[in-house]
Amino acid sequence: METEDDLCNTNWGSSSSKSREPGSSDCGNSTFAGFTSQQKWEDASILDYEMGVEPGLQESIQANVDFLQGVRAQAWDPRTMLSNLSFMEQKIHQLQDLVHLLVGRGGQLQGRQDELAAQQQQLITTDLTSIIIQLISTAGSLLPSVKHNMSTAPGPFTGQPGSAVFPYVREANNVASQSQNNNNCGAREFDLPKPVLVDEREGHVVEEHEMKDEDDVEEGENLPPGSYEILQLEKEEILAPHTHFCTICGKGFKRDANLRMHMRGHGDEYKTAAALAKPNKESVPGSEPMLIKRYSCPFLGCKRNKEHKKFQPLKTILCVKNHYKRTHCDKSFTCSRCHTKKFSVIADLKTHEKHCGKNKWLCSCGTTFSRKDKLFGHIALFQGHTPAIPLEETKPSASTSTQRGSSEGGNNNQGMVGFNLGSASNANQETTQPGMTDGRICFEESFSPMNFDTCNFGGFHEFPRLMFDDSESSFQMLIANACGFSPRNVGESVSDTSL
C-alpha cells in the first residue's frame, strides 16, 4: 500500500511540491483552499470568493460581503439562490422523466390518441408554467437587494471602475447621467425599461414610477417655454355640469361638438361647413400661427399648477376635469357590487364595474387580479408569491367531491385520475382511484403544481406550499400506475373532481 505522502505527491505533482517546503507531508495545503470550498457547498468559506479574485479587490469584496450579511432577511443570499436553482433543476428532471414516460406509453393505448394527446399536452404545459413562475419569483427576489446595494454599499457594488461584482450598474449610471443632462436642456425624459435607475450625483435610487404621473398617460411632450399659452380655469368652472352654452336658448352642453350640432336647429346659417368646423382648426393664410393652449390646475401646490417649480401642463379641458376630480375632490361614486371601491369620476366607476366580482386570478398573498398578465407581473416583483385559486371556486368542487366519494365507497369499477386543486380544507384528501384503464386525465384548473416535498435542500423553504397543493403530484400518480404498483383502497381516496 502507498503511504499518505506518496498519494499526495502522485496526485498533485510538481505544483504541490513547489508550494510546500521540503519534508512537509501536509496534504491540506492552503493553496487548495479554493478547490476545497468548491467541493463542499455547505462550507462557509464559499462566501470568501477566493476563486478568481485579484488580491487588490480581496479586501473590498470581503467588506461588502460582511455588509450583506448584516442586511435584512430579504437580502440576496447565494446559498439560498443555489438551493432555489437546484430545486427547479429537480423539477425539470421530474418533468423530463414524465415526458419520457408518456413517449413510452404512446403505443399502449390505441383508439384514443387525440384525447390523450390533448390531455398530455395540457399536463406538460401546466407543469412548465409552474416552473416558469418559480423562476420568475427567484429572479424577482434579487430586485430589493440590488436596489439596496446600489444605494448604500460602496466600492464594487456601485459600478466604479474595476468592479467585479455588478458590472452592469456602471452602465445604468451612465444612462442616468445622460438622462439628467437631457432634462436640464429641456429635452424629453429618457425612460429606461429597468425598474430602477441610479443617480450618480445625488447617490440615491430613482424608481420608474416617480418619473411619470398617473393622471396623464400621454405625458412626454416637453414644449419649450413660450410656445404655448397657459389657461387656468376656476374651481366652479371645472365642477360645472356644462361648460358650453347656447347663445340663443341658453342650453348647456359638456362638449363643443354637441353645441355645434345643437346650433343647426337655430337656422341655416349654422349648418355651413365653417360653422360646423372645429374652432381654431384652420388658421387664416398669412396670419401668425396661434399658440398651443395648455391648462393649469387651480389647486395651489399641485404639480399641475403653473406656480409649481416642476409644472406639467394639462392638454385639454377634459384632462383638467378628470385630474381635479381624481386628485382634489371627494370620491362620491361607490361600486354597487363590492360596495368598497369609491371613485370621483363616473367613467372610472363604469370601468371598474366591468370586472368587479370577476377577479379569478389570485395570488398566494391574497391579492386578486382581473387579468392574468397583471398577476404574473405581480409575481415577478415579489419573492415567494405564486398563483392560487379563489376560494369561491374551490368550495363547490370540494363539497361535490366529498359527496361523490361517500357514495362510491365500495365501488371498484373503472376509475380515473383527478387533480384536486382545492382549498386547504380538502388538501389532505387523495385524488386517485385505482386503475387507469381509460387513460383519462382530468383537470379542474389551469395550474397543477408538482410535488415539492420530493426534494429537500437543507431546510430552505423559499417556495412556500400553497393552500391548494395536493399531497400527490401528477408525476407520481402516472409513475405509480405505469410501474404496476398496487393501487390504494377506494376507501382512502374518495374524491373525483372531473365532473
UniProtKB/Swiss-Prot annotation:
Triggers of expression: By shock H(+) and Al(3+) treatments.
Residues in C2H2-type zinc fingers: 244-266, 354-385
Domain of life: Eukaryota
InterPro entries reported in the protein's UniProt record: STOP1/2, Znf_C2H2_sf, Znf_C2H2_type
Native source species: Arabidopsis thaliana
UniProt record, GO biological process: cellular response to oxygen levels; cellular response to salt stress; regulation of cellular response to hypoxia; regulation of DNA-templated transcription; response to acidic pH; response to aluminum ion
Transmembrane annotation, as ranges: none
Effect of loss of the gene: Hypersensitive to H(+) and Al(3+) rhizotoxicity, reduced induction of genes such as ALMT1 and MATE in response to acidic stress, and impaired Al-activated citrate exudation.
GO molecular function, one term: sequence-specific DNA binding
Residue ranges of the region described as Disordered: 1-31, 390-436
Purpose: Probable transcription factor. Together with STOP2, plays a critical role in tolerance to major stress factors in acid soils such as proton H(+) and aluminum ion Al(3+). Required for the expression of genes in response to acidic stress (e.g. ALMT1 and MATE), and Al-activated citrate exudation.
Name recorded for this polypeptide: Protein SENSITIVE TO PROTON RHIZOTOXICITY 1
Effect of residue 10 to N: In strain: cv. Est-1
